[in-house]
Amino acid sequence: MTIMVEDIMKLLCSLSGERKMKAAVKHSGKGALVTGAMAFVGGLVGGPPGLAVGGAVGGLLGAWMTSGQFKPVPQILMELPPAEQQRLFNEAAAIIRHLEWTDAVQLTALVMGSEALQQQLLAMLVNYVTKELRAEIQYDD
């Protein structure tokens, strides 16, 4: 049996798509910088009250700048460079090594029939996205 990277990538896309997983690289540094800068300017212009107003306005602006930057995990997976897809493939292949399949459709059906395999693959995927990509996971309901 030839194990294909593409089959496993399609499987991981199906799993993460079914769970409506999204990920965003954290931009908290950007938000903190904007908040701090606005508080500083507010303090220079208006003294202590200006500091409070500048901090509040900066916090809102920073939150607005960093919101809505989540992308679907399947999209992120398909945009990964081949070397990263190979890393994911190696980790997933270790989990599903006992399965035999001929194509991505059959592989997906086999995994979807096993809650244990789904959980193992999802845990591996969440670990990869949070640690390697330094992204935050969000689930849409």
From Swiss-Prot:
Residues in coiled coil: none
Membrane topology, from the record: Single-pass membrane protein
TM stretches of this protein: 40-60
Main location: mitochondrion
Pfam families xrefs: C19orf12
Any single Gene Ontology cellular-component annotation: mitochondrion
Keywords: Cytoplasm, Disease variant, Endoplasmic reticulum, Hereditary spastic paraplegia, Membrane, Mitochondrion, Neurodegeneration, Transmembrane, Transmembrane helix
Phosphoprotein listed as a keyword: no
Induction notes from the record: Up-regulated during adipocyte differentiation in an in vitro preadipocyte differentiation model.
Annotated family: Belongs to the C19orf12 family.
Protein name, per record: Protein C19orf12
Source species: Homo sapiens (Human)
Phylogenetic classification of the source organism: Eukaryota, Metazoa, Chordata, Craniata, Vertebrata
Name of the gene encoding the protein in the UniProt record: C19orf12
